[in-house]
């Protein structure tokens, strides 16, 4: 994971440490990345990111990650427009204020995008079921093309739009950005 995050930084992207580690493992990865970025005088030192869920320990995990050097928290769930995401976003925003950037998602409708922004998300991952490995659309019967979701959401709120899923070619990246996504 360290190598992937560093490669993402080097390519101008954002490497997010996934949430399927223990908090201790996540913190060790974050510290490793921070040390490497510090040693190389990288400007990405302020872009260290890690994912969390919405389970009962989400705030404890978020606090630990921020203490380890995380500047960006990503609430990573398959469908982000539900009460646990609302509770998590509001709690994180109240606890951290503006000193932590919060990304949440995934959603596919203007209403959901607006709600996540209103609940405190700085960035919202747009797209459900478009990824090559994603089974959400099949399992839930819910999903829509990422490009259409971006077009529908782009004028609904001020949070950054992050196109997530359904991006397979460089042309898909260009289309997502042209449609209103702030990042892919």
Tell me what each language-model feature is.
Residues 2-164, 168-183:
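Alpha/beta enzyme core
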